[in-house]
């Protein structure tokens, strides 16, 4: 067989050279293989597997599988050594072959024993039963090496018996099937071996049953599953086509419902065990298990899966490379770190394959002979082994450095920190503690009493053996962090409330122990804002955001965020509760991120409202799709439906706790459309406002729809237009000035924009309009007195600015259509001045006043600012707005 590719490859593989020299590879079969990526179709075409199964020719099946392996492995070697293929092709090809071999052997074994004993039948379902094979480890992640063994677990659906004359229990039947499957692949014959089969990852290992029912597997995982088995099952993949519930029952074992920072210590323990074995056996040259090796890259990917996979289904992946890429995409790891790990992983796996190509041995140890070393270096593109070794060490050092950064032991308490232990003692020196607390600016009596209350309280005394030491380690650090704030007592009280609240979740305590660098940041945030402190108490899962690379990144790409949210929702697989929780976690994370940035002074009030409004838009669009998909009895795939935002949402002036003023519209001639879209409106509202285990999203207000609470939940666009033209009150047209299309069908958006424009530009009697708006303002006084301390309802306050702008739009948009654009009140005052409708000086002063009011409202909410103090500055702002009011309306509203 003459081919330059073969000549190149055989220098680097004794195994390939033997196959070629012994005539084991027929040119007419092998050479065409070199020009393509092998698929299952190629494996199927290699032999008449159906005939072999029909004839129950076990010897022929074993021979053909082994011969096929010889061709597959040889093809992989030639293509890889000649750099025709890449790592992904290599690992996927051998994994696909493993899947094929397992299924082919299983089909044979099942048919063999079915003919002997009959078909296994489920005791409860009365349906035929099949064996599911779970590939673990590299086989599960499509990451097999050419000389890998395969880790398998056998699971069948339920107990029962076969229906043949020689009846057997399902357990016995599937045990026999499993044994024959193993023999077909694992036995060494004159033709070699297909795969070494390792069954030790099954429950109870070698001492456990070879096969388990799904119920037995679930019970084992719940009652006896160990931490290392979580990591093993993370890559578990069912490779057989038969119906099963394995994924559903394994998922909650692998991926915990809450952030699992306890996984750090479990992973460290596993790594220490491996490192100890490596050290004892002198395996420093092992590129898999040694420092900076393949296993450390895998551990880095898996630790984040273990911690966050229960919350982020997008992380419930099998492959190491795809997991690392997703970590970068989600902002959990820095992109440059992920690129470093991916480059190292590919390099190390390429080396691993070349070590195994040499003689088809499962080895990860670098060679010692000069000849083999030089060949290895050349196959990796280096001139010398020394240069190769340098390149290898660069990758290993980078991996090990990142591994140590991520999985190193928590920082030891420094001497500086240990000095604060006096604050948290079982039997404290009361007088000494009070003096020290006072010296650090605390209200000593208040803080000492709170610390004692916690130590002797029910929650602390009932902490687990794991949780209490973690709690004890955090308290002195909290005291130290609070002492650095301008309001140490308030800060510490909030921190201690938070600590007590999260103490029942040991994982959160583990987070604080694992990331002590976040404590100062946490204290600063809580010291600045009781609202943020309460938000964290309500959603402690947001602790995780403190270590996000995106926490202070103000570049919100809402299109990319919406796409990521969509992926997460799809990963829920139609699980409504999981989707609702996903929406809530996404929204809470973005709100918290914005609040932290806001406290850091990175946003103006207007810009922040733009971001909060964009967040609400994103949530509404995603929730609409989910609510429709969740709808029973619908008559079309895509709803002809839209959501319109009014009020603060429509005007893009949302605050952290604003509710959403919504109107639902549809445009669908179907006779059941009214009923269908009313149900959709009700369902969507529930998606937004319902409290789930992950919390809530928004309070909604639907009273601005036609006819208010007495009206339908959803209106046809025709009915909406008719109402606006014939029945709407002036105040409803005022509301329409701030309305905007949020999400839904583009045809409805076009129709709504047309209707809004036509209504707002309708010819009006300006005197009558002004009188109605003044009357509307007067009606507010009994329920909202115009006190100077209330910037919203005071004369010259927020409401007056809004009414002025609404009047200007309704009175003049017909002549000045630029007033129709929903830019917000500040911009519209400027536009009105440019149109000559109001005095430019008064417009500028009113813009300044409106900004001042919004800052006051915002700071009262976020920064614990006192209720508005009536100062000369505030009164001057009121005065300027009142001047503008009088210029526009000619008179002020009279107090009733």
Swiss-Prot record:
This is Bifunctional glutamine synthetase adenylyltransferase/adenylyl-removing enzyme. Involved in the regulation of glutamine synthetase GlnA, a key enzyme in the process to assimilate ammonia. When cellular nitrogen levels are high, the C-terminal adenylyl transferase (AT) inactivates GlnA by covalent transfer of an adenylyl group from ATP to specific tyrosine residue of GlnA, thus reducing its activity. Conversely, when nitrogen levels are low, the N-terminal adenylyl removase (AR) activates GlnA by removing the adenylyl group by phosphorolysis, increasing its activity. Keywords: ATP-binding, Magnesium, Multifunctional enzyme, Nucleotide-binding, Nucleotidyltransferase, Transferase. GO terms for biological process: regulation of glutamine family amino acid metabolic process. SUPFAM superfamilies: Nucleotidyltransferase, Nucleotidyltransferase substrate binding subunit/domain. It catalyses: [glutamine synthetase]-O(4)-(5'-adenylyl)-L-tyrosine + phosphate = [glutamine synthetase]-L-tyrosine + ADP; [glutamine synthetase]-L-tyrosine + ATP = [glutamine synthetase]-O(4)-(5'-adenylyl)-L-tyrosine + diphosphate. Residues 417-896 are annotated as: Adenylyl transferase. Its cofactor is Mg(2+). The keyword Nucleus does not apply. InterPro entries: GlnE (IPR023057), GlnE_rpt_dom (IPR005190), NT_sf (IPR043519), PII_UdlTrfase/GS_AdlTrfase (IPR013546). Its EC number is 2.7.7.89, 2.7.7.42. Belongs to the GlnE family. The gene is glnE. Pfam families: GlnD_UR_UTase, GlnE. Residues 1-411 are annotated as: Adenylyl removase. PANTHER family: BIFUNCTIONAL GLUTAMINE SYNTHETASE ADENYLYLTRANSFERASE_ADENYLYL-REMOVING ENZYME, GLUTAMINE SYNTHETASE ADENYLYLTRANSFERASE. It comes from Neisseria meningitidis serogroup B (strain ATCC BAA-335 / MC58).
């Amino acid at each position: 067989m003459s081919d330059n590719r073969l000549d190149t490859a055989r220098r680097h593989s004794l195994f390939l050279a033997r196959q070629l020299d012994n005539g084991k590879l027929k040119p007419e079969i092998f050479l065409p293989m070199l020009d393509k990526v092998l698929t299952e179709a190629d494996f199927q075409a290699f032999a008449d597997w159906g005939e072999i199964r029909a004839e129950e020719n076990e010897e022929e099946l074993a021979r053909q599988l082994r011969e096929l392996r010889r061709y597959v492995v040889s093809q992989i070697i030639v293509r890889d050594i000649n750099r025709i293929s890449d790592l992904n092709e290599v690992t996927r090809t051998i994994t696909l072959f493993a899947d094929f071999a397992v299924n082919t052997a299983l089909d044979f074994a099942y048919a063999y024993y079915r003919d002997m004993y009959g078909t296994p039948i489920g005791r409860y379902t009365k349906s035929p039963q099949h064996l599911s094979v779970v590939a673990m480890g590299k086989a599960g992640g499509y990451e097999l090496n050419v000389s890998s063994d395969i880790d398998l677990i056998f699971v069948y659906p339920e107990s029962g018996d076969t229906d043949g004359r020689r009846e057997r229990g399902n357990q016995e039947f599937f045990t026999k099937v499993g044994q024959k499957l193993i023999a077909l692949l694992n036995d060494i014959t004159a033709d070699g071996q297909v795969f070494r089969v390792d069954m030790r990852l099954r429950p109870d290992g070698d001492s456990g049953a070879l096969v388990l029912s799904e119920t037995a597997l679930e019970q084992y995982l719940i009652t006896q599953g160990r931490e290392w088995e979580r990591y093993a099952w993370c890559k578990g993949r069912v490779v057989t086509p038969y119906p099963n519930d394995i994924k559903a029952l394994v998922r909650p074992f692998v991926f915990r419902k809450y952030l699992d920072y306890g996984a750090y210590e479990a992973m460290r323990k596993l790594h220490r065990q491996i490192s100890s074995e490596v050290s004892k056996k002198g395996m420093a040259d092992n590129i898999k298990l040694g420092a900076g090796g393949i296993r450390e890259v895998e551990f880095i990917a898996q630790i984040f899966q273990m911690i966050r996979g229960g919350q982020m289904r997008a992380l419930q992946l099998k492959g190491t490379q795809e997991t690392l890429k997703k970590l970068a995409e989600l902002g959990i790891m820095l992109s440059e770190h992920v690129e470093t790990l991916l480059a190292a992983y590919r390099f190390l796996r390429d080396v691993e394959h070349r070590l195994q190509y040499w003689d088809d041995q499962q080895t990860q140890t670098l060679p010692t002979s000069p000849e083999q070393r030089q060949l290895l270096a050349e196959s990796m593109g280096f001139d010398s082994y020394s240069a190769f070794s340098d390149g290898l060490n660069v990758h290993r050092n980078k991996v090990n450095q990142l591994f140590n950064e991520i999985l190193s032991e928590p920082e030891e308490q420094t001497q500086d920190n240990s000095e604060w232990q006096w604050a948290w003692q079982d039997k404290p020196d009361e007088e000494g503690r009070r003096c020290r607390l006072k010296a650090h600016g605390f209200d000593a009596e208040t803080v000492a009493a709170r610390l004692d209350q916690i130590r002797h309280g029910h929650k602390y005394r009932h902490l687990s053996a794991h949780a209490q030491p973690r709690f004890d380690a955090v308290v002195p650090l909290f005291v130290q962090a609070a002492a650095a704030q301008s309001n140490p007592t308030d800060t510490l009280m909030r921190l201690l409330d938070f600590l007590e609240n999260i103490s029942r979740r040991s994982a959160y305590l583990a987070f604080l122990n694992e990331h002590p660098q976040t404590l100062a940041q946490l204290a600063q945030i809580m010291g600045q804002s009781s609202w943020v402190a309460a938000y964290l108490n309500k959603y402690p899962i947001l602790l995780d955001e403190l270590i996000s690379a995106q926490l202070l990144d103000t570049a919100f790409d809402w299109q990319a965020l919406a796409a990521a949210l969509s992926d997460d929702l799809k990963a829920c697989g139609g699980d409504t509760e999981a989707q609702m929780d996903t929406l809530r976690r996404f929204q809470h994370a973005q709100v918290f991120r914005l609040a932290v940035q806001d406290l850091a002074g990175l946003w103006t009030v207007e810009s922040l409202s733009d971001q909060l409004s964009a967040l609400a838009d994103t949530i509404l669009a995603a929730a609409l799709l989910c609510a429709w998909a969740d709808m029973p009895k619908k008559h079309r795939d895509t709803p002809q439906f839209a959501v319109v935002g009014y009020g603060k949402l429509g005007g893009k002036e949302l605050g952290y706790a604003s509710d959403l003023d919504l109107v639902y519209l549809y445009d669908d001639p179907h006779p059941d459309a009214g009923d269908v879209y009313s149900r959709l409106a009700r369902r969507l509202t529930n998606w937004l406002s319902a409290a789930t285990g992950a919390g809530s999203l928004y309070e909604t207000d639907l009273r601005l729809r036609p006819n208010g609470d007495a009206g339908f939940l959803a209106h046809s666009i025709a009915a909406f237009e008719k109402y606006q033209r014939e029945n709407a009150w002036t105040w409803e047209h005022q509301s329409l000035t701030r309305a905007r299309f949020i999400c839904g069908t583009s045809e409805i958006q076009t129709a709504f924009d047309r209707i809004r424009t036509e209504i707002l530009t309708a010819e009006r009697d300006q005197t009558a309009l002004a009188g109605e708006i003044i009357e509307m303002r007067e009606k507010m006084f009994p329920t909202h007195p115009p006190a100077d301390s209330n910037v919203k309802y005071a004369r010259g306050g927020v409401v007056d600015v809004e009414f002025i702008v609404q009047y200007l739009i309704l009175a003049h948009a017909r002549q000045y259509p630029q007033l129709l654009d929903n830019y917000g009140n500040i911009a519209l005052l400027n536009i009105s001045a440019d149109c000559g409708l109001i005095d430019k000086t008064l417009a500028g002063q009113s813009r300044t006043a409106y900004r001042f009011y919004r800052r006051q409202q915002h700071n009262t909410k976020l920064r614990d600012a006192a209720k508005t103090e009536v100062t000369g500055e505030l009164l001057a702002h009121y005065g300027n707005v009142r001047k503008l009011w009088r210029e526009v309306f000619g008179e002020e509203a009279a107090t009733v």
